[in-house]
From Swiss-Prot:
Family: Belongs to the class-I aminoacyl-tRNA synthetase family. ValS type 1 subfamily.
Catalytic activity: tRNA(Val) + L-valine + ATP = L-valyl-tRNA(Val) + AMP + diphosphate
UniProt GO cellular component terms: cytosol
Domain notes: ValRS has two distinct active sites: one for aminoacylation and one for editing. The misactivated threonine is translocated from the active site to the editing site. The C-terminal coiled-coil domain is crucial for aminoacylation activity.
Source organism of the structure: Streptococcus pneumoniae (strain ATCC BAA-255 / R6)
Pfam families reported for this sequence: Anticodon_1, tRNA-synt_1, Val_tRNA-synt_C
UniProt-listed GO biological process terms: valyl-tRNA aminoacylation
PROSITE patterns linked: AA_TRNA_LIGASE_I (PS00178)
Protein name according to UniProt: Valine--tRNA ligase
Taxon lineage: Bacteria, Bacillati, Bacillota, Bacilli, Lactobacillales
Motif window: 'KMSKS' region: 520-524
Gene of this entry: valS
Length: 883
């Protein structure tokens, strides 16, 4: 057992060294109990690009809540940790660091550069694990994985080769998304589309015979040197007679044909479209239909190549300006039409993505997607929480395109394909025998290896691996809705293809962490929050409590320090009531407390308030467990908060003082037993959310660790509806008296007369038998409980279920003075309402002020109106008394 709880809750003291003690005790490893049902989670591997953010903290907190609860419930739990090499993101970070040193990856060469990246990985992997420790994550480090581990690399190679042999991986030349900064291909979902201010540049392409010009509009005039044709719709009467003729490409002064193709929309623009097959996906298809050449006019870094005359070597956007100026100079520019249009940007580097003709590796998605869709119609389907994300998943799968999986990077899984001087290609899990073979320099998309994470981490392709047999498929995946397609869908179709089973039974989807104003956290806004800073100020338990209670599954959560203050205050409340209970414990052990509580349940000992709290504890255990099973942690947290703060601390603990301050030692032992027993169950219910503070308090009265303590279950013997109903009526009576005092501004310290009238003989008997509690909480000078009590003429009255309560006001209150005070208060609220109403009726203020400022004024207005209405009601009550 630990030392006595300190007088003040200090999270830094509570959490210091605790995580290492858990690790030393091996409490996070699977139990190994073959009779226990396995429950496994694989952590969504964070990128080794830097420190974890609040989103990671949220994601991992939810997983830890699940795994800690299941561990306490007796499951054989495995939470497998690991990290992702994050190809393009990590390489970009390392290249940025090298640029600061004045060198590039090309200066170093591939091997030396990769050495630098591994050094980066080791540095940030250490940082991430330190942060996991600060968060209290109960992962099994003995099974830690990395996506470039040899075991995982073996799985990647096998999957690639198997899909290639089935014809589902192929190599081809297509238009892909190209990141000129990273110099690599991107998949469609790695491209973020943003509305930007741009322009349509209208220019004339003169017919070969000079008889007329055709006006063409484009947003990318710099690509005109790659034009190999212009297209018109074959049904467009304006141009169909021109099909087969030639036009002169401005500046280049070369002839290109006019083709008829339905890609040209007569209703859009001029109805004439420039065709640049090497730089536009639609033009690429037109080019294939008409057997047109493909002319690439751009280097891989976004500069113009040698085919563009004096513009060669220019950055694409500088070239755009120069080309437009040249068009204007030669009289080919018709007009520039400003407009906002959607432009693709690289998710990783932020630069504008360039459509580019390139030879890449692709995964053919047709059958893989069909398999994933079909699985959702079976009994073994993946359950999404909330269910609406099943539709999101199916929508992605039904509209999926072939997946470009090759990346022009050095950091990652190098594609297992080799070429020789004879133009032969070999694809295999190992290098081909003999000399003269060169491996493909490209690496695989990071998501290709991540898609295998649930089963490759368990030892696959070694299907006889103990972990694979025991813990796969995994039980639950926790992740954000922003990567359902990036990751979740790919894990599902790869797992179905290679293991014949879904990768997980459940997918819990959470939202995004936003700032107090509802904005997404980003570097550009400067509103990001470092979870380690929050932990330093409030402690990990407070952050975890906030994150678990912030929202429902699938919903975003808004971070605020006000909410963090509330979280800390709640833990401080738990600390204080625990300290009170343990200081008044009298050396009681948990075993003795358990025996005494059994006597309370059977009616051998204790009083009605003891039976009431045990009944409510039972209900709390049932509701919390039910909501945990549905991943409704916010609902479970609300139930716990209400039980702990309201029912246990504010009522039961206060009610027990009647016994603890008495001279009856037998009653004291029973009360102490119920207090300790209930506290113990509360701590066990809370442990998965607040691991540090619950362990600290648990250690004051119990041996071992709460990590492996049994989770509370419902005890049918505690069900006592009569006790529950009776004490709730008692609470209603006490609340009614307190509220009446407040309404007429009578201090709690001033003794008053309380009359309780009830025609319910059982209730009358109950109140009379528990009159000591009523007196303790209401401070009566005179208390009468009876079935026949005439209503006093000048009195406040309240009605509760089964009874009416009167507070005579004679000699207690000067009604005239109270009316005057209330009238003055009413005038104050009216003045505040007038001021805020004037501001909100000002159209200029509403239009120009920040939305959060306007909302703040609206909140003020609602608050003042509520206070005004309450004051009016009190005035009406006072006026009735005067009559």
């Amino acid at each position: 057992m630990s030392k006595e709880l300190s007088s003040k809750y200090n999270p830094a003291e509570v959490e210091a060294g605790r995580y290492q003690k858990w690790l030393d005790a091996d409490v996070f490893k699977p139990s190994g109990d073959q009779k226990a049902k396995p429950y496994s989670i694989v952590i969504p591997p964070p990128n080794v690009t830097g420190k974890l953010h609040l989103g990671h903290a949220w994601d991992t907190t939810l997983q830890d809540i699940i795994i800690r609860q299941k561990r306490m419930q007796g499951f054989d739990t495995l939470w497998l940790p690991g990290m992702d090499h994050a190809g393009i993101a990590t390489q970009a970070k390392v290249e940025e660091r090298l640029r600061g040193e004045g060198i590039s990856r090309y200066d170093l060469g591939r091997e030396s550069f990769l050495t630098k990246v591994w050094e980066w990985k080791d540095e940030y992997a250490t940082t991430i694990k330190e942060q996991w420790g600060k968060m209290g994550l109960s992962v099994d480090y003995s099974r830690e994985r990395f996506t470039l581990d040899e075991g995982l690399s073996k799985a990647v190679r096998k999957v690639f080769v198997d899909l290639y042999k089935k014809g589902w991986i192929y190599r081809g030349e297509f238009i892909i998304n190209w990141d000129p900064a990273a110099r690599t291909a991107l998949s469609d979902i790695e491209v973020i589309h943003k509305d930007v201010e741009g322009a349509f540049y209208h220019m004339n392409y003169m017919l070969e015979d000079g008889s007329r010009a055709l006006e063409v509009a484009t947003t990318r005039p710099e690509t005109m040197f790659g034009d190999v044709a212009i297209a018109v719709n074959p049904e467009d009467p304006r141009y169909k007679d021109l099909i087969g003729k030639n036009v002169i490409l401005p500046i280049a002064n070369k002839l290109i044909p006019i083709v008829g193709d339905e890609h040209a929309d007569p209703e859009f623009g001029t109805g004439v479209v420039k065709i640049t097959p090497a730089h536009d996906p639609n033009d690429f298809l037109v080019g294939q239909r008409h057997n047109l050449p493909q002319v690439n006019i751009m280097n891989d870094d976004g500069t113009m190549n040698e085919l563009v005359f004096e513009f060669s070597g220019m950055d694409r956007f500088e070239a755009r300006k120069a080309v437009v100026a040249k068009l204007e100079e030669i009289g080919a520019l018709v007009k520039i039409e400003k407009r906002v249009h959607s432009v693709g940007h690289s998710e990783r580097t932020g630069v504008v993505v360039e459509p580019r003709l390139s030879t890449q590796w692709f995964v053919k998605m047709d059958q893989l997607a069909k398999n994933a869709i079909a699985n959702q119609d079976t009994e073994d389907k993946v359950e999404f929480y909330p269910p609406r994300f099943n539709d999101t998943f199916l929508q992605w799968m039904e509209n999926v395109h072939d997946w470009v999986i090759s990346r022009q990077l050095w950091w990652g899984h190098q594609i297992p394909a080799w070429y020789n001087a004879d133009g032969e290609m070999y694809v295999g899990e190992e290098a081909p025998e003999g000399d003269g073979w060169t491996q493909d320099e490209d690496v695989l998309d990071t998501w290709f290896s991540s898609a295998l994470w649930p089963f490759s981490t368990m030892g696959w392709p070694e299907v006889d691996s103990e972990d694979f047999k025991r813990y796969f498929p995994t039980s639950t995946l926790v992740t954000g809705y922003d990567i359902i397609f990036f990751w979740v869908s790919r894990m599902i179709f790869q797992s179905l293809e290679f293991t014949g089973r879904q990768p997980f039974q459940n997918v819990l989807i959470h939202g995004l962490i936003r700032d107090e104003q509802g904005r997404k956290m980003s570097k550009s806004l400067g509103n990001g929050i470092d979870p380690m800073d929050v932990i330093e100020k409030y402690g990990a338990d407070a952050l975890r409590w906030f994150l678990s209670n912030g929202s429902a599954p699938g919903q975003d959560v808004r971070f605020s320090y006000e909410k963090m203050d509330a979280s800390w205050n709640f833990i401080n409340k738990i600390w204080n009531i625990s300290r009170y209970i343990l200081m008044n414990n009298g050396g009681l052990t948990l075993d003795v407390a358990h025996d005494n509580v059994t006597k309370v349940a059977t009616g051998e000992a204790g009083n009605v308030t003891d039976r009431w709290i045990l009944h409510n504890l039972n209900e709390t255990i049932a509701k919390v467990t039910e909501n945990f099973d549905k991943f409704e942690f916010g609902v479970a947290g609300h139930i716990l908060y209400n039980f702990i703060w309201e029912e246990f601390a504010n009522w039961y603990v206060e009610l027990t003082k009647e016994v603890l301050y008495s001279d009856n030692e037998d009653d004291k032992v029973i009360t102490r037993s119920v207090l300790l027993y209930t506290l113990d169950k509360i701590l066990r219910l809370l442990h998965s959310i607040m691991p540090f503070v619950t362990e600290e308090i648990f250690g004051q009265y119990a041996e071992g660790s709460i990590v492996t303590a049994a989770y509370p279950t419902v005890n049918p013997a505690f069900e006592d509806l009569a006790a529950h109903t009776g004490v709730e009526s008692l609470k209603d009576l006490i609340r009614a008296v307190r509220n009446a005092r407040a309404e007429v501004n009578v201090a709690p310290s001033k003794p008053i007369t309380i009359l309780v009238k009830t025609s319910d003989s059982d209730l009358e008997a109950f109140f009379n038998s528990n009159v000591n509690y009523i007196k303790r909480f209401t401070n009566p000078e005179h208390l009468e409980i009876a079935s026949t009590i005439p209503a006093p003429e000048l009195a406040m009255s309240s009605v509760i279920t089964g009874a009416e309560i009167f507070l005579p006001l004679v000699d207690l209150l000067n009604v005239e003075e109270e009316l005057a005070r209330l009238e003055k208060e009413l005038a104050k609220w009216q003045k505040e309402l007038d001021m805020v109403g004037k501001k909100l009726s000002n159209e200029r203020f509403v239009a120009n002020a920040k939305p959060e400022v306007v909302q703040k004024e609206k909140d003020k207005q609602a608050d003042y109106q509520a206070k005004y209405d309450v004051t009016v009601a009190r005035i009406d009550e006072m006026k009735k008394l005067v009559k």
